[in-house]
Swiss-Prot record:
EC number(s) reported in the record: 1.5.98.3
Gene: fpoH
Catalysed reaction equations from the record: methanophenazine + reduced coenzyme F420-(gamma-L-Glu)(n) = dihydromethanophenazine + oxidized coenzyme F420-(gamma-L-Glu)(n) + H(+)
BP GO annotations: aerobic respiration; methanogenesis; methanol metabolic process
Activity over temperature: Optimum temperature is 39 degrees Celsius.
Protein name, per record: F(420)H(2) dehydrogenase subunit H
Record-level Gene Ontology MF annotations: Methanosarcina-phenazine hydrogenase activity; NADH dehydrogenase activity; reduced coenzyme F420 dehydrogenase activity
pH dependence of activity: Optimum pH is 8.5.
A GO CC term attached to the entry: plasma membrane
Its membrane topology: Multi-pass membrane protein
């Protein structure tokens, strides 16, 4: 049997889907634990930037602070506004987490090399996985609308309107940047896009403009500084999450950090070579099992730390500046990059 152009011994054939799916699910569970780790990383990194200690009293390096925060969230009173729409208010966090679950189905979270052959670790493999990821990530906005409208609060609704304006403007260049990578590779499968980059010919070098456009648009999609106009504390209290407390707030908070981690994975897979390692590593019996996933996770953590560090490096933009930048700067740059990708793809294909 041939699997992804790889010859697989016949006795393994019946177990290939189960092995990949099981390992993929285990890594997906590990990524959820990574959502908690991302909170600790942000606290420590922010403290380092501000010349503070950060969490240091609860356990070694403050690691048990996460447990303390979880206990606090579990024990806080869950207050629902009296005039809220119960169905929309209660189900908005679940809707947002569902979007993240669907993204995790298609994103490969690692890979192994056995006898030099590549075996990506993903729950499933889709020929149009990159379009699927883009589509299900965009439906997160409906969860935000449900939370804002269901809260029946003016600050929540104003925060959601700002979120709509920002996401409409930045989803377009984000999508074009993804299409540019797919056009040059000749595939909509994120596994093929990652594998095509090889060990050193990463898309960040072939499409530097596309990388800049994608990263800025991703930051806007995440709603991180300088693009957090939807929850600017000085103007809108907490934006569309103003009325959320207890575990419902915890779910929204967790979804935000999970979105950050998945966005970091996409940057690493699409532009930074993903799991690709030199041939001598791939052909090594031990390193081929460990190094690819380790390299991908290292790149993901570095991207995550960059996103977190941006919070303290740049000031918040006004909402009109954000909208102007998307339509007047990023959109033309993304179209220019698309033309470059088409030409480069034709040249490399020739």
């Amino acid at each position: 049997m041939t699997f992804m152009a790889i010859e697989i011994p016949e006795f393994i054939v019946p177990f290939v889907p189960w092995i990949r799916g099981t390992v993929g699910l285990v890594l997906v569970g590990a990524i959820f634990l990574g959502g908690m780790a991302a909170v600790w990383i942000e606290r420590k990194l922010s403290a380092d930037i501000q010349l503070r200690y950060g969490p240091s009293r609860v356990g070694k390096f403050g690691l048990l602070q996460l447990v303390a925060d979880a206990i606090k969230l579990f024990t806080k009173e869950d207050v629902r506004p009296g005039n809220a729409d119960r169905f929309l208010y209660d189900n908005a966090p679940v809707f947002m987490l569902t979007s993240l679950f669907l993204m995790l189905v298609a994103i490969p979270v690692g890979a192994v090399f056995i006898d030099g052959n590549l075996y990506p670790l993903a729950v499933t493999e889709m020929d149009i996985s990159i379009l699927f990821i883009e589509a299900v990530s965009a439906i997160n906005i409906f969860g935000i609308f449900m939370a804002a409208y269901g809260s029946n609060n003016k600050y929540s609704l104003l925060g959601a309107f700002r979120n709509f304006a920002r996401m409409i403007g930045y989803e377009v260049p984000l999508g074009i940047a993804i299409v540019s990578v797919a056009v040059m590779t000749g595939s909509l499968n994120i596994i093929d896009i990652t594998s095509a980059q090889g060990s050193f010919v990463w898309n960040i070098f072939l499409q530097p403009i596309g990388f800049v456009v994608f990263f800025i648009a991703l930051m806007a999609d995440l709603g991180r500084l300088p693009f957090d106009q939807n929850e600017s504390e000085e103007e809108l209290v907490a934006g569309w999450v103003t009325e959320y407390t207890g575990m419902r707030f915890g779910l929204v908070f967790f979804a935000e950090y999970m979105h950050m981690i998945l966005g970091s994975f996409l940057v690493a897979l699409l532009f930074l070579g993903g799991w690709n390692v030199p041939a001598f590593v791939a052909n090594n019996a031990v390193l081929g099992l460990i190094a690819p996933t380790g390299i991908l996770l290292l790149k993901t953590v570095l991207v995550l730390m960059t996103i977190i560090g941006m919070r303290w490096a740049v000031p918040r933009f006004r909402i009109d500046q954000v909208v102007d930048m998307s339509w007047k700067k990023l959109l033309p740059l993304s179209l220019l990059n698309l033309a470059w990708a088409v030409g480069l793809g034709l040249y490399l294909g020739a």
